[in-house]
Structure formats: C-alpha cells, structure tokens
C-alpha cells in the first residue's frame, strides 16, 4: 500500500453547477442537487454519473454522491472527472477537506474552485482506494437500508391508522381528551451552569430540523438539574409526543426517554388507554390543519389553548387496543433501527479520517469483528 502527496486538482476537476430556475423544473427521473443535498428531480440531466457534489455557496462542507445522471445546481461544485481515481473514494476524501479554509472573503462567502484545487491531499493506490470506499460504503449502504425499512414501517403504521380511524369520522371530543398538553421553557442562557452535555434532555425545534429520526432523547444542549429547577419546563415521560408549535409549526417526534423542551413545543402525554401511536399518527395526519390554526399572525404559533381544543374522533377502546397491539412492535423496531443507524454513523465518521490518512490499514479492518468497544476506542482517539 503506497500513498502519494498531490493537490486536489490532480485527482478531481470541480466545476460550477448549472442554472435551473424552479419555474423551469419538470419532475422526472434525475435528481437535482443544491449545496445542501437533493432538492427534487428534473426531466433532464446536466451531467452523467458517477458525480460528486459539494457546496459553492450557501451550505459549505457537505458532500453528496450520485451514481446516476443528475443536475447539480449553480450553488454547487461538481465533478464527473476523477483522473483514474475511484469516484467513491474521492467522495469520501472530499468529506475530510477543510472547506471553510477556502471560503472567499466577500460579501457572500463561497468556495473558489481554483483555490480549493490547490488543497494538499494524500491518496493511496487504486486498489487501496476501492478497499477504503468499500468499507465505508458498506456502512452507508446499511444505514440507507435501515432508513428505507423505517420508511416502509411508517407507511404500514399510517395505513393501519387510516383504516381504523377514517378522516371523515365525526368529531366526538378534543385533543385534551386523549392526553395532557404540556408546554416548555428555556433556562437563562446567561447562566452556563444551567447547561451541560450529559444531563436532562432538552429539545428545541432546531433539534428536530437537524434530524430525520422519529425518536429523540437529547438535543444539541442538555440542561442540568439546576437549570431545570430554574424555569417552568416540565419533564415529559418516555412515549410523549413532541409537537413544535412555532418556528415552524409541525415538527413531530416521540420521546425515547424522559425529556424537556423549550417553549417552541406543545407536547402531548398520551393517556394510557389511548397510547403513543394513536396520538403520533393523529398529529402526523393533522399537522397541516393545526398549522393553519396558527396562521394569520406576524409570528405563527399554536397556543396551548388552541392545541387542547383541536377536535377529533375519540377512538373506541377496542379499536385503540387493536391499533396499539399492531403499532407497538413497529415503534420498537423503528427505534432500534434509528439507534443502529446512529451507531453505524459514529463508526463511519470515526473510521473516515483514519482510513483516509492511512492511520488505520484498511486491510486490517474486518467489519464482522467490530463491536461497540472498538467504536468507542475509535471515537475516543478521533
């Protein structure tokens, strides 16, 4: 295994993406990529695959890969020229670059491709490149498979809900009949002792915007016991359904453990005889109706009073029990798959810089022998 020092421009040729006004887009088979990832599809492709894409303006530092033909937008840099290198290896290599070091000093900072082409990189022989991308690709493929399975389980769950609880059923009660609606609060940001990294889970709408996970136990910041006592935040039990009531309205998640939230939520603690699954599915199916209740103001928000008064058809106990029996295993499987994905992502992110630098010899990596202790060691050393 040999490694050679080169510049980025010697292994890939980044180019500016293509204009495509939204008014000219026609849904089709080809993915459209902006600086923040896929943003829809188009009936035509601008380039053939494989293709790597990263941000030129806007979101900087994220890197995307398309095996198929696609359309990189003008906010991105892309390349289909890999100069004899493994395209997937180049994709992972780009993920390790210090992109922000190459931002232009202008009113709207962006990446100048001529500057970033001078970035020094160290690359191995082609055989080692494919071995590295193979290991990292296996982890990404498993994450993708788990995500697709979770999506399928979500479809099953909502289809069963729709069958048992039709949308045209007569209203017989309000949301507060099926659970307790609880708001949140924020400890003073001026008191650093109120916040920590391993305390009481404290969730904000931004935390939900940064994840596609259905279950959540911690956000960016946790709060301390002192921080919790300093404000009116309430501890929501595991299984509570979090619903963002402003900025924006309609993010939904399930508490994987006891959590608190900031004031951007009106969360529901379901009654035992109703269950988490029913409340979750009701909110998913009615989030646009709820959002409309908060519209028409300068700062759209759904108040606690509004939330409590949302009309619904109170489920019969027999139907509720049937749905809970069906939904319980699905929720457990979804939570387990999300947990596995976080572990796989942690492993991938720990391996990535070490494989790319040659610190870890890829020929010595056996994914079948990797356990949580190995992952913990990698993360600690990272």
PLM region descriptions:
Residues 1-34, 120-186, 197, 313, ...:
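Non-catalytic DNA-recognition/assembly elements of restriction-modification systems
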Residues 2-123, 173-315, 363-382:
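DNA target-recognition domains and sequence-specific DNA-contacting regions of bacterial/archaeal
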């Amino acid at each position: 295994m040999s490694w050679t020092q080169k510049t980025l421009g010697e292994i890939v040729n980044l180019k500016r993406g293509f204009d495509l006004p939204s008014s000219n887009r026609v849904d089709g088979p080809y993915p459209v990529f902006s600086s923040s990832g896929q943003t829809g599809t188009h009936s035509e492709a601008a380039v053939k695959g494989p293709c790597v894409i990263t941000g030129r303006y806007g979101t900087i530092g994220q890197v995307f890969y398309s095996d198929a033909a696609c359309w990189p937008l003008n906010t991105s840099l892309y390349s289909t020229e890999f100069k004899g290198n493994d395209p997937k290896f180049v994709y992972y290599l780009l993920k390790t670059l210090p992109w922000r070091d190459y931002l232009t000093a202008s009113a709207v900072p962006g990446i100048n491709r001529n500057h970033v082409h001078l970035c020094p990189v160290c690359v191995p022989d082609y055989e080692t490149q494919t071995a590295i991308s193979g290991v990292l690709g296996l982890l990404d493929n498993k994450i993708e498979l788990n995500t697709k399975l979770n999506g399928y389980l979500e479809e099953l769950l909502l289809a069963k809900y729709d069958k048992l609880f039709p949308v045209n059923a007569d209203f017989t009660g309000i949301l507060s009949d099926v659970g307790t609606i609880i708001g949140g609060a924020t400890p003073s940001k001026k008191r650093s002792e109120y916040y920590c990294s391993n305390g009481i889970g404290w969730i904000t709408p931004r935390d939900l915007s940064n994840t596609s996970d259905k279950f959540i136990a911690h956000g960016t910041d946790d709060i301390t016991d002192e921080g919790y006592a300093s404000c009116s935040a309430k501890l929501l039990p595991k299984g509570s359904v979090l619903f963002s009531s402003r900025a924006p309205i309609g993010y939904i998640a399930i508490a994987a453990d006891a959590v608190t939230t900031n004031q951007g939520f009106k969360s529901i603690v379901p009654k035992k005889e109703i269950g988490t699954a029913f409340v979750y599915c009701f909110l998913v199916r009615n989030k646009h109706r709820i959002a409309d209740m908060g519209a028409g103001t300068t700062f759209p928000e759904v108040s606690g009073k509004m939330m409590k008064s949302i009309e619904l058809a109170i489920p019969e106990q027999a139907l509720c029990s049937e749905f809970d029996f069906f939904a319980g295993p699905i929720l457990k499987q979804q939570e387990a798959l999300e947990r596995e994905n976080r572990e796989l992502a942690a492993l991938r992110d720990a391996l990535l810089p070490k494989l790319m630098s040659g610190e870890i010899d890829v020929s010595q990596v056996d994914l079948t022998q990797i356990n949580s202790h190995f992952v913990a060691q990698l993360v600690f050393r990272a």
